[in-house]
């Protein structure tokens, strides 16, 4: 196995639980990181977190030198999924706005990074609950072993009040405090 070096890290994470029963990410002002106001306005919280961290990590690397974007999420864009499902039920499956569905797909962060930076390289997203980030790291290590040099590997997740209640009721959070971030 060849050596792998981490050249840059970025994180948006929780600092305290505040009033919520889970760790909620302390988000920065995204205006400096995601300069396009229209694009920023259309992005959900999770997409902003992931894209901001990805842009920070890739800011000194020319787009043509990025060999891979490998992202991971445990459950995906939950807020957008909830928004789409609620609209689906409220509108009886008619006259739906596709934006919430499009942004609820798991590969949105990797795709946004590729579009923003004009990166035409390997781009994959792992969705596997608790093993997603590990899968992304393994893929990144294997990519480097194959000769790729500049690989972005990252993860992001969000928690909504509804998803937190569901996970609690299913017993998925026993002995842990849930958290979100990128």
Describe these PLM feature segments.
Residues 137:
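Short-chain dehydrogenase/reductase
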Residues 1-134, 142-149, 156-182:
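Conserved "HGTGT" condensation-loop signature of ketosynthase/thiolase-family condensing enzymes
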């Amino acid at each position: 196995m060849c050596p792998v070096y981490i050249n840059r890290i970025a994180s948006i994470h929780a600092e305290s639980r505040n009033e919520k029963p889970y760790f909620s990410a302390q988000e920065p002002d995204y205006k400096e990181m995601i300069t396009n106001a229209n694009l920023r306005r259309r992005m959900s919280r999770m997409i902003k977190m992931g894209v901001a961290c990805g842009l920070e990590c890739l800011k000194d690397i020319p787009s043509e030198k990025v060999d891979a974007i490998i992202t991971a999420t445990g459950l995906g864009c939950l807020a957008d999924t909830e928004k789409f499902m609620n609209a689906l039920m409220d509108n009886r499956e008619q006259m739906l706005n596709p934006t919430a569905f499009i942004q609820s797909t798991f590969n949105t962060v990797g795709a946004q990074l590729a579009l923003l930076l004009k990166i035409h390289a390997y781009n994959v997203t792992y969705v596997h609950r608790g093993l997603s980030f590990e899968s992304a790291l393994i893929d990144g290590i294997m990519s480097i072993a194959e000769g790729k040099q500049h690989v972005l590997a990252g993860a992001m997740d969000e928690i909504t009040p509804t998803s937190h209640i569901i996970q609690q009721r299913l017993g998925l959070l026993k002995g842990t405090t849930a958290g979100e971030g990128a």
